[in-house]
């Protein structure tokens, strides 16, 4: 199967700043009960995804392009760059910020945690 990539502009995600572009590589239906989505996320300059907690899900991020700040479960601010992997476990919180003048591009996958009803 070949289909067009589904895209959506979302504003102030999880209380963050500005607009981000969500590109859905796999939708919830295509995840076959294993998670919510696999996507490419573009954070334009000076935008962010606000800090939030994952309940019943885990989320690995892979940084493809640009540089940013990963805010971990303890609110520690950690610089990230291409090739870095950020893993958010069930019950942990995180946020992602792009304080630069270039796009920050990540691949993220929201998967159901252990014991999560699918």
PLM regions with names:
Residues 60, 87, 102-117:
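A short hydrophobic beta-strand segment most commonly corresponding to one strand
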Residues 40, 60, 75-78:
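Short, surface-exposed secondary-structure edge patches
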Residues 42-44, 53-70:
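Short, conserved beta-strand element in jelly-roll/cupin
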Residues 74-90:
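Short acidic-glycine-tyrosine-enriched beta hairpin
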Residues 1-36, 50, 117-118:
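A short, N-terminal "cap"/entry segment at the start of jelly-roll beta-barrel domains
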Residues 45-47, 56-57, 76, 92-93, ...:
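A generic "binding-loop/recognition-motif" signal
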Residues 50-51, 70-71, 88, 94-101:
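Short beta-strand His + acidic residue motifs that chelate non-heme Fe in jelly-roll/DSBH
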Residues 24-26, 39-55, 90:
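Conserved short histidine dyad/triad with adjacent acidic residue
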